[in-house]
Design a protein with these regions (language model features):
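Divalent metal-coordination and catalytic microenvironments
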Residues: 4, 84, 127, 159, ...
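Hydrophobic alpha-helix feature that most strongly marks membrane-spanning transmembrane helices
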Residues: 81, 97, 121, 145-152, ...
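Acidic, glycine-enriched loop/beta-strand segments at the rims
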Residues: 77, 102-113, 155-160, 168-205
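Feature captures the catalytic cores and cofactor-binding loops of soluble hydro-lyases/lyases
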Residues: 131-133, 143-150, 162, 192-202, ...
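C-terminal cap of metal-dependent C-N hydrolases
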Residues: 38, 114-121, 127, 189-234
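Short, solvent-exposed cationic patches
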Residues: 236-243
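Flexible loop/turn segments at secondary-structure boundaries
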Residues: 8-14, 99-100, 130-134, 167-170, ...
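Active-site neighborhoods of metal-dependent hydrolases
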Residues: 1-152
């Protein structure tokens, strides 16, 4: 058994996925909007939303991160007030009529996060898409800054293993994950005490600092903490023959 994990307590997903029933969004956001036009169907959808809001931590902690115009950066409770409404269920419906908001919902807890982080079968990941959650730009820096250096949950050696070779071995990524002759040369040079995760839920794409020199497929992509403009990344496919 294997798993991967990012080091944040909030999930990130579309409002339609988080706060409407699966049957209502079957076929995508356009199909959902068509169903909402029918009063009987709309009433059925709204009847299921309160429990979904509760399961995501409540309107006061559901954070709108992207794709919602002036509502970006607000909680669902704040957006409800801005819309002149009192019920967050009605706010969900109003927002989904014209937008496709993306949410951060705080559904995890630190104890569980740390418990799984210690497991040898759990690897590092971001699970991130651009501009919606700090995990995309901050996961590895957050692991080093908080869980290696501050809280001592992981040793630096364990962090490196779960972020490199273990991933390459699990996914059969030939020539990756290890520094050795004939490999692709993906190398990150840093001092752990300098690494900072700068991304936040309000500013999810603030880049980490402290990864002073980064080599991607043999080309220098970051030098002295500055991007060089190199475009040396490539699609990585499963391979079983080691390079």
């Amino acid at each position: 058994m294997t798993a991967d994990q990012y080091p944040y307590l909030a999930s990130g997903l579309a409002m339609s996925s988080a706060l409407t029933p699966a049957w209502a969004r079957d076929g995508g956001i356009k199909a959902l909007r068509e169903r909402m036009k029918d009063p009987v169907t709309l009433a059925k959808i709204k009847a299921e939303i309160p429990d979904m809001i509760y399961e995501r931590g409540g309107a006061e902690t559901i954070f709108i991160s992207k794709r919602a115009g002036d509502f970006n950066g607000m909680t669902l409770a704040e957006a409800t007030g801005k819309l002149g409404l009192t019920d967050p269920v009605d706010a969900v419906i109003e927002l989904l009529k014209t937008m496709s908001p993306y949410l951060n919902t705080f559904v995890a807890n630190e104890e569980d996060l740390v418990n799984y982080m210690k497991r040898l079968w759990v690897m590092s990941c971001t699970d991130g898409s651009v501009g919606t959650h700090p995990r995309a730009a901050g996961s590895y820096a957050e692991l080093i800054q908080t869980y290696v250096m501050q809280k001592k949950v992981l040793t630096l050696e364990r962090f490196v293993r779960r972020s490199t070779g273990q991933v390459a071995d699990t996914y059969h990524l030939a020539g990756r994950g290890y520094i050795k002759a004939g490999g692709y040369a993906d190398i990150n040079i840093f001092k752990p005490e300098e690494v900072r995760a700068n991304a936040s839920y309000a500013n999810p794409m603030l880049l980490a600092t402290g990864f002073r020199n980064v080599i991607v497929n043999g080309q220098i992509a970051v030098e002295n903490d500055q991007y060089t403009g190199a475009l040396s990344g490539m699609v990585i496919r499963r391979e079983t023959n080691k390079k």
